[in-house]
Amino acid sequence: MEKFFSPADILLAKTDLTKWSVIACDQYTSEPEYWAETEKTVGDNPSALKIVLPEVYLSGDNSQRINEINRNMKEYLESDVFETLQNTMILTLRTLKNGADRKGIVGLIDLEDYSYEKGSDALIRATEATVVERIPPRVEIRKDAILEMPHVMLLINDPKKTVVEPLTLNVEDYEKLYDFTLMQNAGSVKGYKIPDETVAEINRALETLKNENDGLLFAVGDGNHSLATAKECYKNHNGSRYALVEVVNIHDSSLEFEPIYRTVFGADPNTLINAFVEAMGGEYEGADAYKYTCVFGAGERKISLKAKSRLAVADLQI
């Protein structure tokens, strides 16, 4: 039997976990007040906030902030802030702020099984075009870091619910590792240690999914660029071969997929659309054309363009 997903040695803070746990560093990038409130909540307590670099601060010179992060990591390791959960896989039960419950499994994947290249047939694949220019700054931030705080979610296509969901049937028999409220009205989360004998069952179920999905097992649902950076660090011999991730079923009822819109206010619709078409090289009707519907007031206008962007989302709503 192949092993696609493994237990890990996981560091768990022994402090107030509500103040320890913060949202992913790439969130609230246009709301510095959110991060200011987080700093106020954390105060002088040990916190993940002090060993990550929120992207809201990326515009300036961050060398001093990065040095401080590295010092904090060293201090936390030396001052017994963590306990080590050896050879552990965790069942996570997250209650979102809207009341929905999301189930996941935290464990290790092998970066040799992952590729962000377009057209890859790897076991683990990206779900959006990777902007390679985003990788070097992230590599620089991680260069001297002795701890990793990942926020990567891998999705499995498991309509029969054979991997994650069966674990919840026996959760009362599992050792509870944590149970706490997340700050800033973000819901709550519980974590349970998955028994060693159950890990083999998880991998057997994953092997079946792999065979049913033509070799594709995991799709990166969140953290595409984080995982790409981890792969780049590994390739450059400056990082681990393995990455800590959470595996979630794409059929989990808590997951809702919605389009991302860009809204422009205070502009003449046709003037803006004409400028957009011109910037994209004019109308294009080729087989690889992107079709856009621009909506404004009670009207709409359809345009067809040859996309220059490597991003998955490129919609304009007026």
PLM regions: where:
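Short, glycine-/Ser/Thr-/acidic-enriched flexible segments
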Residues: 56-58, 159, 225, 234, ...
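Short conserved micro-motifs at the rims of enzyme active sites and ligand-binding pockets
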Residues: 61-64, 165-166, 255-260, 303-307
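N-terminal extension/subdomain marker
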Residues: 1-185, 193-195, 207-209, 215
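Compact, glycine/acidic-enriched structural inserts
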Residues: 168-194, 257-282
